[in-house]
């Protein structure tokens, strides 16, 4: 294909308009010359010929290679582009048929009008019939004649809203006009003026749809084009081209134009006179209008209607296919036309035109001289010298632009130098009557220079003022036409007030909380109910007000803009931060202090630790901050603004005469983008995208290993033995003491050792025993200590505290540097009663630091970050004391536990090649014949192959992109909340035999395959309806190795039980039963064979291996064993920050405690706790106040409730809020004070004062990573200092039986002498994406103690399991008590309903969403994975009678291109790479405008308005179900509503009998903030194990005491 020549090139109308706007920006000084040339080149590049494109690329290369200066480059590019514009051809130079054949789209093909004339010989509306056409066509640029100096007519150059005209199809090719030929072509033609019915059609609201709007818009766009030379000439004027004098009013379009003579006279006059003339024409246009008369006018109209009908005829199929094939080369659809002044869409049915002023309306300057407005009597003298500006009020006002389009004054047009005027009745400033009575009708006041707001401080009514060149006007009531615009302004101002007060009064509020506040606020008079749509509509203004408020913040103060709710609002609405609107005067916002919470009650111990840690750190951080400049985005207006020269930072700058030491940026240039980004970086999403595929068996380091530490071999001093060896072997001689220079070292001493790396600190070790090798090397066995800084405590540790670890090594005596002292600090006998003492340092064992004295009190596990009591092991009888090492003994025991050990061999050896056993010991379990075992899913498979559930991809070709324009965004197959990637649960087998072969020592198990319901031919449906622990016996067998066995479980026949299956299942998590056998070949169920009912296979063993009994006897023995569990006394629990009691409920289910006391400040949550724990004392007071009273010796609270005293509390649990800090990685001095005064410090002080036996702190997963782990380290440091054993971990609630991803950080602590609990193993499989539970502490990765990382005993719990049995309800259902529809359908439902005497379903109620939100929910499909991207783009009548609009796509999308039908995909100018334009915003659309606006930057907002999947799970916590909230999918899978309170409660694992209190939002918040009871119950079961172990150990010690006394007496 031959390349296009210059003369063949076409500039489309939309590109022409963009060039014109760019020219105007250059003339106004809004853009630099460099930016102008670059943007102009970018706009025109695709329309240039290949030769010119190559030439421009060559110039770029020369500029990069520095062969060309930047100025020379810009000049050459500008010259090339100007030449191109001069010589380009018209866009409609071809006929309709030729355009079509060349692949042009229909709209361009039908553009046949040239030179402002129609095919019937009439000129277009508003154009002159003179010859001054300047060679300009309605489609684009043509070569201009140098003789023509005047511009085009008004409608051609300035107006984007000319009435389009059409040819009849244009069967003949139009000739391009040259020189003044364009004017000649227009001579003698009739001017078209609108008839009555046409004029009425312009002004009336849209009552019917017009199919030809798009076509008319295209031609209207093509009829207004301006040569580049004209733009350059007009740039010499004082006023910008955008505000040119030739811009007419809307009424002037309908008036008869002056004669040719008058026009020529006008053009010869000055530009200021033209302005005045146009203003007069605009105001008096109605008087000058003339109606078309005679048949000529009607004929013109009839011909045009016929042509419009021809336009909208559908294309033939063949043409349609051709059109699709060529859509890449032809522009399918162009952006709709906009008014150049107000930027409103010209075909918008809501576009309103100013109806005009009253006949007696005056000019502004005349009105201002009216004596009725004067406040003076004439005797004041020089009073006016003090008040330079007049101030009045105006009522019944209306704001409009130069085109008389009624428009909003708050959309940024004033800032863009657009002239806005207003009319109304001016009244004196003291007149508060909003009626027009007594007002002076005034027309065309302005233009408006600025607008401002007042009344932010305390008042409910916000006042708004306009400022013109002559006066200021406080606005009162709008006219009827302007009411919708005025209501929107009132909304946004009042909403700003609500938002700022909300941010002041709440700590770290989330977006859903903000929505609740907005939606529940009573709007001011005249405003509609506040909704999420109105919040998003006004987001830019509201955020700017918050930015203005933040301007008064101190440098290290947390900005309100960084609050979670504000960050989400900014992302959703696509707010541009850092805008500084020069022409809008915002009212000064009073900087109110946030409400001061009660000062934290902190014990001296906690306070001392905080002060000691932060004393040096804050100083270091301040130095670091001084040398570190604030980061900037470099894009926002704040970053690009100059320094103010007045603030403290500026005064320190060298350029302002300062020292330059601080190196801080101007206070007015605090970049909001970077502040928001830092806060975002500190957040960790609940759903981790990384899969947890690490296997514990692949850990490099095992617990109890010997450490190989690189040490210096070279002798540092002379070493000699001091005595004779205590034992001599062939290779070694053991000694008790040695002399190192002048220091004597004995067994049990501690020494400092030189590391091989001199940059590392000296190692510390205890000398366990010493010897000399046969080769002469003098050695000792070292048991290592680690410094506190080497543990998870890091920099928060006590510098004198060390921790022994289970690592030891043979070391050279010559590497010892010196002897040191390490003292064991034992807990005092009255440890539990000395909490909260005034001087916590009295128990310090080191009185003076000499650099070589240290102490220890806890043992440390580096792999799991556990601090435990140091336990000394006694030497076994077979190991001599002089070479006994407790670490080595622990190593051996750990190794034995990991190594399989055989039990008794069976006498009946059926196969000579095998050795049969009755049992084997492995990982602490004894596996016997007849036991059930857990196996990984890959160990064996079943004969029934289940259909793999995969999401069926929807072909994009099957989607109607015009109806579903956002569906193309659904490119990813992954759906958040889906279980498609969920692993399978363990396979379960029942051991038939255990054996090894004589040729191979590998232990093998032969097992019966036990089928789960989902493994049978019935599939998942059967699993959903069956108990979780039901199995089916099968005759199928599998052979596996003992090493792959994951655990042990109980598998019994239901007929062998002497209790019900429900009672049996309630006895523990690892109990399974079967009633039937399954035959996979015949796909049928049958009675199990008799051999399956034998709990132990018969066989005679050797030695102790005896045959086991059959049937109920063995089951009864197991039950008898369980019934002899060690009893223990339940703990007395204090639940701080109790909420509605999720933690307490879980501990009740575990049976470990009694909820004696609870503290909850929020009254609704406290009432809920009382309802569910009637025997508990619930305090609704501030926890700080209560602790202060107790520490002061008070016995009762202010309300007379009895306070717990020292020694009363045995279990302390709670989740203190960790809020109010910035997103920075470290504390600053202000935040340190804030943290010291936080609820975390209060909660730790509760622990210090009461010294309970067990302590639990629950928080969000982010808690462990916050501030570079500093918050976690401080909490652990305080617990260690108190004397507690402690650890931390991350748990996933979904792994304990709830259909929800909820990762939580849990700190556990146990008092000295107690056993520190481990974290519970997962019970249910869950999405691997959400199960990353490791934590990075510095460069160290801390793992969970869980062994079941790849699978778990039970399948995952789904949404279907949770709530499929609940009755159908509608949006806004409010009936608190209803009946169940039927019986429970799943095991989860059966358990969650409990044993109610009269089953009543409570709280199955849901939020009443607004009409628009309800319509959106109704149109979300029911298919899995559906969300907002599946919404149709249609107008819908809402339940309140209003109609939501169709979303309009007005811009090209650089990233996503066009649809398959050629439709645009951008809804804002930012889609094209430009700045956001406020006029692009759309509201009340079924597809929320904000989502496609910012979707490209935020993963297409996947999940908003998303439905839950029946087979999926809830995404994170739902504290307030909002379809556009951050909390994931909240729409019911099948019903058009958000999830109900009871459904949320079930997702957390609360029983149906559990009560909540308060409003529907209170109940949602109580549920969402609670700890899931199933997870709390799993933790409680681990605490229960520790209690039983401790009780059993105490009983054994008590039993040994009499024996010991008797032995001592006998010796005496």
From Swiss-Prot:
EC number: 2.1.1.37
Keyword Protein biosynthesis on entry: no
Enzymatic reactions: a 2'-deoxycytidine in DNA + S-adenosyl-L-methionine = a 5-methyl-2'-deoxycytidine in DNA + S-adenosyl-L-homocysteine + H(+)
InterPro entries: BAH_dom, BAH_sf, C5-Methyltransferase, C5_DNA_meth_AS, C5_MeTfrase, C5_meth_CS, Cytosine_MeTrfase1_RFD, DMAP1-bd
One Gene Ontology term, aspect cellular component: nucleus
Residues that hold Zn(2+) 1 according to the record: 633, 636, 639, 671
Disordered, as annotated region: 87-338, 677-708, 1084-1121
Subcellular location: Nucleus
GO biological process: DNA methylation-dependent constitutive heterochromatin formation; methylation; negative regulation of gene expression via chromosomal CpG island methylation
Biased composition (Low complexity): 115-131, 143-154
GO MF annotation: an example: zinc ion binding
Regions of compositional bias (Basic residues) in chain numbering: 1093-1111
Domain named DMAP1-binding: residues: 7-101
Start-end of Acidic residues biased regions: 678-688
Binding-site residues for Zn(2+) 2, renumbered to this chain: 644, 647, 650, 666
Residues covered by the SAM-dependent MTase C5-type domain: 1131-1590
Zinc finger residue extent: CXXC-type: 626-672
Function text: Methylates CpG residues.
The protein's name: DNA (cytosine-5)-methyltransferase PliMCI
Organism: Paracentrotus lividus
Gene: DNMT
């Amino acid at each position: 294909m031959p390349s296009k020549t210059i003369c063949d090139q076409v500039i489309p109308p939309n590109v022409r308009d963009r060039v014109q706007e760019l020219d105007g920006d250059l003339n106004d000084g809004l853009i630099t010359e460099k930016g102008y040339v670059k943007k102009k080149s970018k706009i025109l590049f695709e329309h240039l010929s290949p030769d010119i494109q190559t030439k421009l690329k060559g110039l770029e290369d020369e500029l990069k290679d520095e062969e060309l200066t930047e100025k020379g480059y810009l000049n050459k590019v500008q010259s090339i582009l100007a030449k191109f514009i001069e010589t380009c051809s018209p866009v409609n130079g071809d006929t309709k048929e030729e355009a079509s054949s060349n692949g042009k789209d229909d709209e361009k093909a039908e553009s046949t009008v040239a030179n402002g004339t129609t095919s019937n010989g009439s000129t277009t509306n508003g154009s002159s019939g003179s010859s001054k056409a300047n060679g300009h066509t309605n489609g684009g640029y043509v070569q201009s004649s140098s003789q023509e100096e005047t511009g085009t007519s008004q409608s051609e150059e300035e107006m984007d809203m000319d009435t389009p005209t059409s040819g009849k199809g244009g069967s003949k090719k139009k000739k391009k006009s040259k020189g003044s030929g364009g004017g000649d072509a227009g001579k003698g033609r009739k001017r078209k003026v609108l008839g009555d019915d046409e004029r009425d059609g312009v002004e009336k609201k849209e009552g019917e749809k017009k199919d030809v709007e798009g076509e008319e818009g295209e031609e209207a766009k093509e009829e207004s084009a301006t040569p580049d030379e004209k733009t350059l000439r007009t740039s010499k004027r004082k006023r910008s081209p955008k505000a040119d004098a030739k811009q007419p009013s809307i009424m002037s379009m309908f008036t008869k134009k002056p004669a040719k003579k008058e026009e020529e006279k006008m053009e010869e006059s000055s530009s200021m006179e033209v302005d005045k003339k146009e203003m007069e024409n605009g105001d008096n246009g109605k008087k000058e209008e003339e109606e078309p008369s005679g048949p000529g006018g009607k004929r013109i109209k009839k011909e045009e209607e016929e042509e419009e009908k021809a336009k909208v005829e559908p294309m033939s199929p063949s043409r349609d296919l051709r059109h699709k094939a060529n859509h890449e080369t032809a522009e399918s659809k162009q952006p709709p036309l906009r008014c150049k002044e107000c930027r409103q869409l010209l075909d918008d049915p809501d576009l309103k035109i100013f109806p005009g002023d009253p006949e007696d309306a005056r000019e502004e300057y005349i009105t201002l001289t009216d004596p009725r407005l004067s406040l003076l009597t004439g005797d004041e003298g020089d009073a006016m010298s003090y008040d330079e500006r007049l101030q009045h009020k105006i009522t019944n006002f209306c704001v409009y632009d130069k085109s008389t389009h009624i428009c909003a004054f708050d959309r940024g047009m004033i800032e863009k130098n657009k002239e806005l005027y207003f009319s109304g009745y001016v009244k004196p400033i003291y007149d508060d009557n909003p009626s027009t009575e007594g007002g002076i009708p005034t027309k065309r006041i302005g233009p408006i220079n600025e607008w401002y707001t007042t009344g932010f401080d305390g008042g409910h009514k916000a006042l708004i003022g306009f400022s013109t060149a002559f006066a200021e006007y406080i606005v009162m009531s709008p006219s009827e036409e302007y009411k919708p615009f005025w209501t929107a302004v009132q909304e946004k101002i009042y909403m700003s007030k609500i938002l700022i007060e909300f941010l002041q009064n709440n700590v770290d509020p989330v977006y859903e909380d903000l929505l609740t506040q907005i939606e529940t606020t009573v709007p001011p008079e005249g405003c509609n109910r506040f909704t999420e749509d109105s919040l998003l509509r006004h987001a830019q203004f509201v955020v700017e007000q918050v930015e203005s408020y933040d301007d008064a913040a101190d440098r290290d103060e947390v900005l309100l803009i960084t609050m979670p709710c504000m960050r989400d609002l900014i992302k959703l609405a696509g707010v541009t931060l850092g805008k500084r609107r020069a022409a809008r005067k915002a009212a000064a916002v009073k900087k109110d202090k946030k409400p001061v919470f009660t000062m934290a009650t902190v014990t001296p111990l906690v306070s001392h630790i905080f002060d000691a840690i932060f004393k040096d750190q804050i100083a270091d951080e301040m130095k670091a901050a001084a040398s570190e400049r604030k980061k900037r985005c470099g894009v926002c207006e704040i970053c690009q603004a100059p320094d103010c020269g007045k603030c403290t930072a500026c005064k320190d700058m060298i350029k302002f005469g300062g020292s330059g030491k601080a190196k801080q940026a101007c206070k007015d240039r605090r970049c909001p983008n970077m502040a928001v980004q830092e806060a975002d970086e500190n957040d960790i999403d609940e759903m981790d995208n990384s899969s947890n595929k690490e296997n514990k068996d692949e850990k490099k380091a095992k617990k109890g290993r010997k450490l190989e530490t690189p040490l210096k071999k070279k002798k540092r001093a002379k070493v000699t033995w001091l005595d004779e060896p205590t034992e001599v072997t062939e290779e070694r001689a053991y000694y008790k003491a040695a002399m190192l220079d002048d220091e004597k070292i004995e067994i049990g001493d501690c020494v400092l050792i030189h590391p091989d790396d001199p940059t590392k600190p000296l190692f510390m070790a205890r000398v366990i025993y010493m010897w000399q090798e046969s080769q002469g090397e003098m050695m000792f066995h070292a048991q290592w200590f680690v410094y506190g800084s080497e543990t998870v405590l890091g920099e928060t540790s006590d510098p004198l505290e060390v921790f022994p670890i289970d690592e030891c090594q043979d070391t050279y005596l010559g590497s010892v540097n010196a002897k040191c002292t390490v003292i064991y600090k034992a807990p005092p006998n009255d440890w539990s009663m000395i909490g909260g003492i005034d001087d916590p340092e009295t128990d310090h064992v080191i009185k003076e630091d000499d650099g070589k004295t240290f102490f220890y009190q806890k043992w440390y596990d580096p792999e799991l970050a556990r601090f435990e009591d140091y336990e000394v092991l006694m030497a076994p009888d077979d190991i001599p004391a002089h070479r006994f090492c407790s670490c080595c003994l622990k190593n051996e025991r750990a190794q034995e536990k990991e190594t399989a050990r055989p039990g008794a061999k069976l006498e009946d050896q059926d196969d000579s090649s095998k050795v049969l056993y009755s049992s084997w010991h492995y990982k602490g379990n004894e596996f016997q014949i007849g036991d059930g075992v857990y196996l990984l899913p890959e160990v064996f498979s079943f004969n029934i192959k289940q259909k793999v559930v995969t999401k069926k991809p929807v072909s994009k070709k099957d989607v109607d992109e015009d109806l579903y324009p956002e569906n193309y965004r659904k490119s990813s197959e992954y759906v958040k909340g889906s279980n498609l990637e969920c692993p399978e649960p363990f396979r379960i087998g029942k051991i038939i035999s255990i054996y090894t072969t004589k040729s191979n020592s590998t232990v093998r198990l032969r097992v019966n395959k036990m089928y789960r319901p989902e493994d049978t031919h019935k599939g998942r449906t059967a699993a959903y309806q069956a108990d979780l622990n039901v199995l089916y016996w099968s005759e199928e067998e599998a052979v596996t190795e003992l090493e792959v066995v994951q655990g042990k479980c109980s598998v019994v026949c239901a007929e062998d039980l002497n209790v019900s299956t429900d009672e049996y299942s309630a006895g523990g998590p690892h109990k399974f039963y079967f009633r039937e056998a399954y035959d996979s070949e015949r796909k049928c169920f049958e009675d199990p064979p008799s051999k399956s009912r034998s709990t132990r296979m018969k066989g005679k063993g050797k030695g102790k291996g005896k045959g086991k009994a059959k049937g109920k006897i063995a089951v009864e023995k197991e039950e008898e064993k369980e019934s002899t569990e060690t009893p223990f006394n339940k703990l007395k629990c204090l639940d701080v920050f109790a909420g509605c009691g999720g933690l307490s409920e879980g501990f009740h289910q575990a049976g470990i405690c009694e909820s004696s006391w609870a503290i909850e400040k929020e009254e609704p949550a406290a009432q809920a706790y009382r309802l569910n724990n009637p025997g508990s004392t619930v305090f609704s007071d501030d926890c700080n106040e209560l602790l202060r009273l107790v520490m002061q010796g008070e016995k009762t609270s202010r309300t007379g409730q009895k306070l717990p005293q020292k020694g009363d509390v045995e279990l302390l649990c709670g989740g203190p809020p960790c809020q109010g800090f910035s997103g920075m990685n470290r504390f600053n001095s202000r935040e340190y004070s804030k943290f010291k005064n936080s609820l975390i410090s209060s909660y730790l002080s509760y622990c210090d004062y009461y010294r309970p036996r067990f302590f639990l702190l629950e928080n969000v997963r982010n808690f462990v990573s916050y501030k570079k782990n500093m918050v976690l380290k401080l909490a652990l440091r305080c617990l260690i200092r108190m004397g507690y054993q402690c650890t931390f971990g991350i748990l996933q609630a979904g792994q304990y039986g709830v259909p929800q991803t909820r990762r939580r950080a849990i700190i556990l602590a146990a008092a000295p002498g107690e056993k520190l609990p481990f974290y519970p193993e997962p019970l249910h499989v869950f999405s691997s994406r959400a199960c990353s539970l490791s934590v990075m502490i510095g460069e160290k990765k801390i793992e969970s103690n869980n062994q079941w990382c790849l699978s778990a005993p039970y399948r995952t719990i789904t949404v279907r399991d949770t709530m499929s049995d609940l009755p159908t309800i509608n949006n806004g259902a409010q009936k608190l008590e209803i009946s169940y529809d039927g019986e429970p359908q799943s095991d989860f439902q059966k358990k969650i309903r409990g044993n109610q005497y009269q089953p009543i379903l409570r709280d199955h109620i849901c939020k009443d969403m607004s009409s628009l939100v309800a319509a959106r929910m109704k149109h979300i499909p029911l298919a899995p994975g559906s969300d907002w991207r599946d919404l149709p783009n249609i107008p819908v009548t809402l339940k309140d009678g209003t109609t939501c609009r169709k979303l309009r796509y007005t811009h090209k999308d650089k990233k996503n291109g066009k649809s398959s039908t050629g439709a645009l995909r951008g809804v804002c100018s930012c889609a094209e790479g430009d700045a956001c334009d406020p006029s692009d915003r759309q509201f009340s659309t079924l597809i929320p405008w904000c989502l496609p606006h910012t979707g490209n930057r935020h993963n297409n907002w996947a999940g908003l308005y998303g439905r839950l999947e029946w087979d999926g799970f809830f995404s994170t916590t739902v504290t307030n179900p909002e379809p556009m909230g951050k909390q994931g999918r909240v729409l019911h899978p099948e019903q058009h509503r958000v999830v109900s309170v009871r459904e949320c409660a079930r997702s957390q694992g609360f029983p149906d009998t559990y009560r909540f209190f308060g409003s529907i939002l209170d109940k949602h918040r109580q549920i969402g903030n609670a700890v899931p009871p199933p997870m709390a119950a799993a933790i409680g079961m681990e605490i229960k194990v520790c209690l039983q172990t401790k009780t059993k150990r105490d009983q054994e010690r008590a039993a040994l005491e009499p024996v010991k006394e008797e032995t001592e007496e006998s010796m005496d």
